[in-house]
């Protein structure tokens, strides 16, 4: 399963671990993904989404129906 937020599209980033001696080794910064179920009143069913905490805040701000319609236009669901 890809580590991508379904709402915001956030993906892992690549960076460096930097030691005290300034030695650099590659690492990945992973998004804070959560699996959440949302009850959709208009469809009378549960929707499961894999999203970041930023995606949860977008749903809190805009509502689940607006986010789902946006996902459907993008072809995510």
From Swiss-Prot:
Pfam families: Ribosomal_L28. NCBIfam families: L28 (TIGR00009). It comes from Polynucleobacter necessarius subsp. necessarius (strain STIR1). The keyword Ribosomal protein applies. GO terms for molecular function: structural constituent of ribosome. GO terms for cellular component: cytosolic large ribosomal subunit. HAMAP family: Ribosomal_bL28 (MF_00373). This is Large ribosomal subunit protein bL28. It comes from the Bacteria. One of its GO terms (biological process) is translation. Keywords: Ribonucleoprotein, Ribosomal protein. InterPro entries: Ribosomal_bL28, Ribosomal_bL28/bL31-like_sf, Ribosomal_bL28_bact-type, Ribosomal_bL28_sf. Belongs to the bacterial ribosomal protein bL28 family. The gene is rpmB.
């Amino acid at each position: 399963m890809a580590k991508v937020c379904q709402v915001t599209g956030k993906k892992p980033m690549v960076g460096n671990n930097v030691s005290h001696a300034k030695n650099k080794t590659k690492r990945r910064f992973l998004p804070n993904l959560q699996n959440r179920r949302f009850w959709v009143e208009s469809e009378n069913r549960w929707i499961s989404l894999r999203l970041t905490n930023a995606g949860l805040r977008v749903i809190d701000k805009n509502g689940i129906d607006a986010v789902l319609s946006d996902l459907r236009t993008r072809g995510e669901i």
